[in-house]
Design a protein with these regions (language model features):
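Conserved alpha-helical substructure of the radical SAM core
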Residues: 1-136
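Short Fe-S-cluster ligation motifs
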Residues: 69-88, 313, 355-403
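Short cysteine clusters
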Residues: 17, 21-24, 264, 279, ...
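Processing junctions and N-termini across compartments
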Residues: 11, 15-18, 42, 321-324, ...
Length: 403
């Protein structure tokens, strides 16, 4: 079928990261080792070496794309119609060639955004990226409170992030902040918004955890209660009104509390594409781990234009012809596109099913059962599993579980 021109490319240039966030959307099978919050160092001692960059389900044995390969991908994306590129990971600053990739994006006339934890982004690197043409930075924070933030990240990172935010502003680069919201930090939403004001962010995303990758593994610990979600929504709405014209605030609800599915990335293969560290091209960043039965083409063997227009993986759920009932007869089908394919796969083991978040899905009971379990256990302390990294030096030594 015919395809729209893509609007944005997410360039996951590495899955290496100095942090260990338990809600990371990266694949969980890069390493088989696990580490609980009660002993985060145990997992680090068995963390994967830097070369272990291919997940168990991958169809190739390649390592990360080279500088030259990424530069070619960027040129092909621009030729395909892409207007914006996000450099993500993992932690994209783990790649020393990041300024070269940003420069390639500028030469291709793409708007570039760095999605980062900020670790490693000192004043020298900030200015190098600015001079290469970087347009904006999205800086992640785990909380406004340093102790809580460092426990969530599994690393001493919060104080460094504050310095990074100041460096970004001083360099004249547009700054947005991203707070990933979950049960352990959602009650500090007012303080997070206050921190964004202090740091001078122009945009703030208050994003409830979406349950893929490590977040799916830790769902029972991370999913907030309905009372927490409703209270947070009211706080975010009030802040959006109060700060109108100064800070753009976006509050992203957790899917499970919705009754209709989100139009995930404006539909499968419609406007967005992701290239992961080893060169697989995905309709969304979680597709290869959530739907392993699909074969995803690689930029080392096919050009981006062919993959976007012709590949089986991009066409499998593009449009509406693939839809089962009740989606096929739904008047919303060209608005929500049946919801999220990865969520359908994770919850029902069939990516072609209606997203079970939808109130009309025959599988909505799965989501309702998850919510019942969350509310029945909301007063109990749980440990989570930290994300394990392909390369994971860290000085974090806390051994206390979060209550």
């Amino acid at each position: 079928m015919s395809a729209h021109r893509p609007y944005a490319l997410l360039a996951e240039i590495t899955h290496r990261c100095p942090l260990h966030c338990p809600y990371c959307s990266n694949p969980t099978d890069y390493c088989r080792a696990t580490a609980s919050v009660a002993d985060p160092e145990a997992g680090r001692r068995s963390a994967c070496p830097t070369t272990a960059l291919t997940p168990a389900h991958a169809k190739t044995n390649y390592g990360e794309l080279s500088t030259e390969e990424w530069q070619r991908v960027i040129r092909e994306a621009a030729a395909l119609g892409v207007l914006q590129i996000g450099f993500s990971g993992g932690e994209p600053l783990a790649r020393r060639d990041l300024p070269e990739l940003v420069r390639a994006a500028r030469e291709a006339k793409l708007y570039s955004n760095l999605i980062t934890s900020g670790i490693g982004l000192d004043d020298t690197r900030v200015r190098a990226l600015r001079d290469a043409g970087l347009d904006s930075v999205q800086l992640s924070f785990q909380s406004d409170d340093a102790d809580l933030a460092d426990k969530i990240a599994g690393a001493h990172a919060h104080e460094r992030k504050l310095d990074v935010a100041a460096n970004i502003r001083a360099a004249g680069i547009a700054l947005s902040l991203n707070f990933v919201i979950h049960r352990r930090n959602i009650d500090r939403l007012p303080q997070m918004i206050e921190l964004a004001e202090v740091l001078g962010a122009g945009r703030v995303e208050l994003a409830n955890v979406q349950f893929y990758g490590w977040a799916f593994l830790n769902r029972a610990v991370l999913l907030p209660t309905r009372e927490q979600v409703d209270r947070a929504r009211n706080i975010a709405t009030a802040a959006k009104t109060r700060l109108a014209g100064m800070i753009d605030i976006f509050y992203v609800l957790p899917d499970y509390y919705e009754t209709r599915p989100k139009p995930c990335l404006s539909g499968w293969g419609q406007r967005y594409l992701t290239v992961n560290p080893i060169g697989d091209v995905l309709p969304c960043s979680t597709a290869s781990s959530a739907i392993p039965e699909l074969r995803f083409e690689n930029v080392r063997t096919r050009d981006l234009d062919w993959i976007w227009r012709e590949s089986e993986s991009f066409n499998r759920f593009r449009g509406t012809q693939w839809m089962p009932e009740p989606c096929r007869s739904c008047p919303q089908k060209e608005i929500d596109f049946g919801g999220c394919r990865c969520q359908a796969a994770l919850l029902t083991e069939n990516a072609a099913n209606t997203d079970p978040v939808c109130e009309f899905s025959p599988n909505r009971a799965i989501v309702d059962e998850v919510l019942r379990n969350v509310h029945s256990s909301r007063n109990h302390a749980h440990d989570w599993t930290y994300r394990i990294n392909p390369s994971a030096p860290s000085s974090f030594e806390s051994s206390r579980a979060l209550a």
